[in-house]
A protein has these predicted regions:
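Structural and coupling elements of P-loop NTPases
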Residues: 1-178
């Protein structure tokens, strides 16, 4: 959110072209071009950032209230669709509890069916804590992951005593290349 003319809706909509079922967990709050906070789509609570990066609760701004409502409905439907039991409950009751949504979101994320979308500005130290909390809550620990075969054809299991294995990559767009 720290780039000039950053457009949340365009980025969110663009995820569908990647074949990903994106679920918006946050909607940015802006004052002009400045990223000043976010609305939690699941709870409907809004938060603003202080000068020191501290977060405080505030009212949902009128200019994003309709977007939050639409995204809330879409997010609930996508989470429900990712789990047969949740879908039945959603169809019977017409809604899901926050706890059901959080459990369904984690299951769908771990299964690779859902892609949570959050907002932050690392350059301005805004929203990073919420992103890290989402990573902790939604992604599986290494101990929950199955064994895999590495590039050398060896099976590797999660082991805290084994050497660190990682894959580092960077994407680059060169404006001068064809």
């Amino acid at each position: 959110m720290d780039r000039d003319r950053a457009d949340f809706q365009m980025a969110f909509d663009g995820l569908s072209t990647l074949g990903v079922k994106a679920v918006a967990l946050q909607v940015p709050i802006r004052e002009g071009e400045a990223f000043t906070g976010y609305v939690d789509v699941l709870t409907g609570k809004a938060y603003t950032f202080g000068a020191d990066g501290a977060v405080s609760e505030c009212d949902v701004p009128a200019d994003v209230a309709d977007d939050v409502s639409l995204l809330h409905d879409l997010t609930v439907e996508n989470i429900a669709e990712s789990d047969e039991e949740l879908m039945e409950k959603y169809l019977e009751e017409g809604s899901l509890s926050l706890e059901d949504l959080q459990i369904g979101l984690r299951k769908g994320t771990v299964a690779g069916e859902l892609c949570p979308v959050l907002v932050c500005s690392s350059l301005e130290n805004k929203g990073g804590v919420a992103v890290l909390e989402a990573i902790q809550a939604l992604l599986p620990a290494a101990s929950e992951r199955p064994a895999f075969v590495d590039a050398l054809g060896q099976e590797r299991k999660p082991d805290p005593d084994a050497p660190v294995a990682g894959f580092v990559f960077k994407t680059l767009a060169d404006p001068f290349s064809g």
